């Protein structure tokens, strides 16, 4: 065995004998250079096991870090889902129609019946009525006391309708008596000629019996159906139906009044209310308005037309009369087809309104089969509570329209059940209201509950920030600030109390004013009545009415109560202003107490100012809700990362900078010595081997075994560079430790160093890259927590975090959509598979593999 020794094999100037031995003794003698003897196979297995352990430890650290990150992400997503669910529930609840609303309404003390029928006024869109939409109606178990002279809604309805028609229509005396006789209308089948014959026993024509009535004062004779007239004492005297029942007797009106499309309501104002007895013991309905009434709807035998297709065709007939004088008014005949019509009184003869843009006609129709009606234009009619002589344009209505309504409109029985009551004072009354007649809830952006919650949350945040500043800066001033705050609260409460007292006085003044106005109206009515009775001759300035003057008629409220109310209102105004000024001064003093130029104080004041400016406009835009929620969400989810980054900056900046300078210094000197070591190694190798390449490569391979690394390792930076970075000692001593004493430590350090650094491990070392980097890498590291403020700053990080959150939310949505599509595809596949199996089963049953049917054989 020949031993060849040479020096200078290890860089750094230490001469280490390296021997070239045979394969047999290589294992025993290499122990002086290695902690234990191993070959290539054992080296690979040990490296693999060590790498597996390192990977396992790295995975554990990554899982812990990922778990910490996921915990905050899950908390943020939970808060997001919770807020979204809460907002959705509030939105749904605000738009949900409430079936019953239980509460208290202060409507007064004892409810007594009132005879002031003129307190009931017309409210609606019709000209002459008040435009008002705030109707309410409550159910209560309060018992009502009614006087004998209590006004009903029907009486006020008579008065209002009479006023409307008398002020809008032309007066007429057509309700006088007519001399009528019964006639028959006979027609031939071959022509449209109809003969009028005087008979005793009449027969129906066109579904009606006919009368020929003569109005001698105007030399007018009309041919009218018997259903429009009323006989008096079984004589030849007849009057139009409804003349003895209605107040207004007018001739012609504007067409729009006759349409039946003007809804009105008869309503009252406090202290008056309308009460309807429900027919149950101690159960009533109280409100400010009665039922809806439509002007122009016929009172008797109405017909409710429904459906789109309705058509009426005029039937032109020639009426032949032997002899007559003056005007002879003939009827207009129609044949109508109603696809869907209902008779309100279950009678075969009904009244229907047919109109165009510029004309209207009231038809009296008789049903001859299921959908066909024989109709005739009426001459007289009862519209609302006014008896009218209807306009009869002698032409066909081409584009017919039919008014649609229900049978309960203008029901006299219902109007008689509503009574007028009067009350005074303030007394709570338990009530319940249905949504369609009482309190109507409207949808808002996030609902009123969400707005209130947002205001409370914003105020709480501002107050918390302000109080946090006080606690952090000047603890000794907290008591003083609290005293000022308590003064502000007390002043605000006192101001609210004064405002409530002022409102009560104002309400009493309004009630008294309304009562005086109603008294003036009643006096005007009495005066008009006296003028009609006693002052017939208009030339007399003074006249006798026949009734003694009552001093109570001119008695108004001449007490000093009104002056007392005015003085109290002035005093309360002054007290309210004084209280509010005091509250403002206390609030200003509390702010001055901690008014310092400190940045935290300025932040608290600015936050309070911004939120105070936001509160009046919270309901104006939904964007503020979204921005506020995103800011809160980012604050909750990003606080740990921000604090961790600040801790790394403050604690690791010094050590990181020191390691960075050492690294640069040793890297520069190591490059010089590395060049010198390579030159020495080449000279020594040339002198010893004498050009023997095989021995050189064997020693190279043996050296690789001794180092425990592959060729890829030789291309990486030397391990002694990382040794110096790991232990912080001198170059010579650390190089000796890394190459001879602890060869594995340098390898592990190299694997876990900058070359294999994992950004997800959450290391506290702050790496400062001299070559810089792009914004994307910077912000990604900022989001992961490894590099935050020194690189890209908080605003850019905040914007990028918002983009990441939106992207993740969109990703969740797309993944959910993919799951839904996958489930649908599976369902379709299942359905197709079931259909396939059924078809296959039926096919196999119809076409079995073995046929048991024997066919006849012919020989």
Swiss-Prot record:
Region listing for Fusion peptide, in residue ranges: 446-466
Immunosuppression: region residues: 498-513
Site (Cleavage): 444-445, 684-685
UniProt entry tagged with the keyword Glycoprotein: yes
Domain of life: Viruses
Membrane-side (Extracellular) residue stretches: 7-614
Name recorded for this polypeptide: Envelope glycoprotein
Gene name of the encoded protein: env
């Amino acid at each position: 065995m020949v031993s060849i020794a040479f020096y200078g094999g290890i860089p750094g100037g230490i001469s280490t004998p390296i021997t070239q031995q045979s394969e047999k003794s290589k294992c025993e003698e290499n122990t002086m250079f290695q902690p234990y003897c191993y070959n290539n196979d054992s080296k690979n297995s040990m490296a693999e096991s060590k790498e597996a352990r390192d990977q396992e430890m790295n995975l554990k650290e990554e899982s812990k870090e990922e778990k910490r990150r996921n915990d905050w992400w899950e908390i943020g997503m939970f808060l997001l889902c919770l807020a979204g669910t809460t907002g959705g529930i509030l939105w749904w609840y605000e738009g949900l129609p409430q079936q019953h609303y239980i509460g208290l309404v202060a409507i007064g003390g004892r409810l007594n019946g009132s005879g002031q029928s003129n307190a009931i006024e017309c409210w609606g869109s019709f000209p002459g009525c008040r435009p008002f939409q705030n109707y309410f109606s409550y159910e209560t178990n309060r018992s009502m006391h009614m006087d004998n002279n209590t006004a009903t809604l029907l009486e006020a309805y008579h008065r209002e309708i009479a006023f409307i028609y008398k002020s809008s229509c032309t007066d007429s005396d057509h309700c006088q008596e007519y001399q009528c006789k019964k006639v028959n209308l006979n027609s031939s089948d071959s022509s449209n000629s109809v003969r009028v014959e005087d008979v005793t026993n009449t027969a129906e024509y066109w579904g009606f019996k006919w009368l020929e009535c003569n109005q001698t004062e105007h030399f007018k004779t009309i041919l009218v159906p018997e259903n429009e007239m009323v006989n008096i004492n079984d004589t030849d005297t007849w009057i139009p139906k409804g003349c003895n029942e209605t107040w207004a007797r007018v001739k012609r009106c504007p067409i729009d009044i006759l349409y039946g499309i003007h809804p009105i309501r008869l309503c009252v104002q406090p202290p008056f209310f309308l009460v309807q007895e429900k027919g149950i013991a101690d159960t009533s309905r109280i409100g400010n308005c009665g039922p809806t009434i439509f002007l122009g709807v016929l009172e008797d035998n109405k017909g409710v037309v429904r459906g789109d297709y309705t058509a009426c065709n005029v039937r032109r007939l020639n009426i032949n009369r032997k002899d007559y004088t003056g005007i002879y008014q003939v009827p207009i005949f129609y044949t109508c087809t109603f696809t869907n019509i209902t008779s309100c009184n279950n009678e075969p003869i009904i009244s229907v309104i047919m109109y165009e843009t510029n004309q209207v006609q009231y038809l009296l129709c008789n049903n001859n089969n299921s959908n066909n009606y024989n109709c005739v234009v009426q001459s007289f009619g009862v519209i609302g509570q006014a008896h009218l002589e209807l306009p009869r344009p002698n032409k066909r209505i081409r584009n017919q329209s039919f008014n649609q309504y229900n049978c309960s409109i203008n029901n006299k029985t219902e109007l008689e059940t509503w009574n007028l009551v009067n009350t005074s004072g303030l007394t709570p009354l338990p009530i319940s209201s249905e949504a369609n007649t009482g309190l109507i809830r409207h949808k808002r952006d996030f609902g009123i509950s969400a707005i209130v919650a947002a205001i409370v949350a914003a105020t709480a945040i501002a107050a918390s920030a302000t109080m946090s500043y006080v606690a952090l800066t000047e603890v000794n001033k907290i008591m003083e600030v609290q005293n000022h705050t308590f003064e502000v609260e007390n002043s605000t409460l006192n101001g609210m109390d004064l405002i409530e007292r002022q409102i009560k006085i104002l309400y009493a003044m309004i009630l008294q004013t309304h009562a005086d106005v109603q008294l003036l109206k009643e006096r005007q009515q009495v005066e008009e009545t006296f003028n009609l009775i006693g002052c017939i001759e208009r030339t007399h300035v003074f006249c006798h009415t026949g009734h003694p003057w009552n001093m109570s008629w001119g008695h108004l409220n001449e007490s000093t109560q009104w002056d007392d109310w005015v003085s109290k209102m002035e005093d309360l105004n002054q007290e309210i202003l004084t209280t509010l000024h005091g509250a403002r001064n206390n609030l200003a003093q509390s702010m001055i107490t901690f008014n310092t130029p400190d940045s935290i104080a300025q932040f608290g004041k600015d936050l309070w100012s911004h939120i105070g400016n936001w509160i009046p406009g919270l309901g104006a835009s939904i964007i503020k809700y979204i921005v506020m929620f995103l800011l809160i969400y980012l604050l909750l989810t990003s606080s740990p990362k921000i604090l961790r980054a600040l801790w790394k900056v403050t604690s690791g900046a010094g050590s990181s900078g020191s390691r960075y300078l050492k690294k640069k210094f040793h890297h520069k000197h190591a490059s010089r010595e590395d060049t010198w070591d390579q030159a020495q190694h080449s000279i020594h190798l040339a002198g010893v081997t004498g050009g023997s390449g095989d021995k050189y490569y064997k020693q190279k391979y043996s050296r690789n075994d001794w180092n425990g690394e592959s060729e890829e390792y030789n291309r990486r930076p030397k391990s002694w560079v990382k040794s110096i970075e790991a232990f912080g000692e001198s170059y010579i001593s650390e190089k000796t430790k890394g190459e001879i004493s602890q060869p594995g430590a340098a390898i592990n350090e190299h694997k876990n160093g900058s070359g294999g650094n994992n950004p997800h491990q959450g290391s506290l070392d702050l790496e400062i890259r001299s070559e810089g980097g792009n914004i994307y890498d910077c912000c990604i590291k900022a989001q992961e927590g490894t590099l935050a403020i020194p690189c890209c700053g908080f605003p850019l990080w905040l914007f990028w975090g918002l983009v990441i959150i939106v992207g993740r939310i969109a990703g969740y949505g797309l993944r959910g959509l993919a799951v839904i599509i996958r489930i649908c595809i599976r369902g379709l596949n299942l359905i197709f598979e079931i259909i396939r199996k059924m078809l296959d089963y039926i096919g196999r049953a119809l076409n079995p593999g073995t046929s048991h049917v024997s066919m006849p054989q012919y020989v």
